[in-house]
Amino acid sequence: MRLSGRGLRCVRGGREVFDGLDFEAAGGEALALIGRNGAGKTSLLRLIAGLLMPAAGSIDFDGSEPDTPVAEQAHYLGHRDALKPSLSVVENLAFWRDFLGGEPTDLMAGITAVGLSHAAELPAAYLSAGQRRRLSIARLLVVRRPIWLLDEPTSALDVRGQAMFARLMSDHLASGGLIVAATHSPLGITTREMRIGAAA
C-alpha cells in the first residue's frame, strides 16, 4: 500500500503555494510535514483529501481498492473540530459515521477508546476543548479508512490525551494504515519528516 504525489502545484487565492512537489508514504508509515507557516502543509493535506484540486500533478494510492478515489479512502482531521453543538457525543459520532458511509458499528467502542464514555450523552456544546478534540479523533475509529490526514492533531490535548492518541496512531500503523500529518508538536510515534518550502 503506497500513497504518492508527483509534480503537485497548488494555487490558492491567486498565489502559488508550491510547485513541483513530490511525496510518498507507505503502509505502516507516518509522514510528518514540517515547514514554516504558509509553506503549504495544510494545503497538501487538503489536496490529498480532495478538498482542493491541484493546478498540476497527480495523487495516487496503490491500495486494496484501486478504483476508489483517494479522498474516499482517507480521513481528514483538520485543526478545527467539526461538531454540532446541540448533538450529544454519541449523536455527533453517529452523524459522522453515516455521513462517511460507514457500516453500523458500536459507537461506544470508539467513544471509550478516546476516554469519553462518561460524557456519551452530553451535548458537544458542554465539552472542553480537549474533549472536543477527543471526539473528533473518535471519527477516525468508527469508519475504517487506511489513510489518516492530520492537521495539528494534538492541539488542545493534554499529556494524557496526547498519549492516548499516540496509542491509536500506533495501532493504525500496525494494522497497515498510513498517516500524513502537519504538526509543530511531536506526535509520540516514529515519523519520517518531509520539509515543505524553504527552511525558516
Swiss-Prot record:
ABC transporter domain boundaries: 1-200
InterPro entries associated with the record: AAA+_ATPase (IPR003593), ABC_transporter-like_ATP-bd (IPR003439), ABC_transporter-like_CS (IPR017871), ABC_transptr_haem_export_CcmA (IPR005895), P-loop_NTPase (IPR027417)
Gene Ontology biological process terms from the UniProt entry: cytochrome complex assembly
Record field: catalytic activity: heme b(in) + ATP + H2O = heme b(out) + ADP + phosphate + H(+)
UniProt keyword list: ATP-binding, Cell inner membrane, Cell membrane, Cytochrome c-type biogenesis, Membrane, Nucleotide-binding, Translocase, Transport
Membrane association type: Peripheral membrane protein
EC number(s) from the headed UniProt entry: 7.6.2.5
Residues given in the record as ATP binding sites: 35-42
Quaternary assembly: The complex is composed of two ATP-binding proteins (CcmA) and two transmembrane proteins (CcmB).
Job description of the protein: Part of the ABC transporter complex CcmAB involved in the biogenesis of c-type cytochromes; once thought to export heme, this seems not to be the case, but its exact role is uncertain. Responsible for energy coupling to the transport system.
Family (UniProt): Belongs to the ABC transporter superfamily. CcmA exporter (TC 3.A.1.107) family.
Protein name per UniProt: Cytochrome c biogenesis ATP-binding export protein CcmA
Annotated source species: Rhodopseudomonas palustris (strain HaA2)
Lineage: Bacteria, Pseudomonadati, Pseudomonadota, Alphaproteobacteria, Hyphomicrobiales
Gene for this chain: ccmA
